[in-house]
Design a protein with these regions (language model features):
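Extended beta-strand/beta-hairpin segments
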Residues: 1-56, 66-95
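Alpha-helical metal-binding/catalytic segments enriched in His/Glu/Asp
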Residues: 58-62
């Protein structure tokens, strides 16, 4: 039996409900998560900020792709720690 080929193009839908001025409830694949702002910025701190969510997605993608590349090359990763240091210049985005 041959290797399973993944689809090159996939479609999916994500929905966001504005629960408040700072919190968005996100739904996809039967899962729900929140994107929120910290209390000091008027949020309820129930989830990552939008910027933190973006960096978390990059960290998650780095994990998945690294493991796929390792497996393809016959390497077993016993442990991997991904560290992201971020310096975010908020000038121009602060309303």
């Amino acid at each position: 039996m041959g290797a399973v080929r993944e689809k090159m193009v996939v479609k999916w839908r994500m929905e966001g409900e504005a629960a408040s001025h700072s919190r968005t409830d996100i739904r996809i694949r039967g899962l729900t998560t929140q994107i929120d702002e910290p209390i000091e910025r008027g949020g309820t701190n129930l989830g990552l900020t939008p910027t933190e969510t973006l960096v978390a997605a990059l960290v998650g993608c780095t994990n998945v792709i690294s493991h796929k590349i390792a497996k393809k090359n016959g390497i077993e990763l016993a442990h991997m720690h991904i560290h992201a240091d971020v310096e975010f210049d908020r000038r121009g985005v602060t309303l």
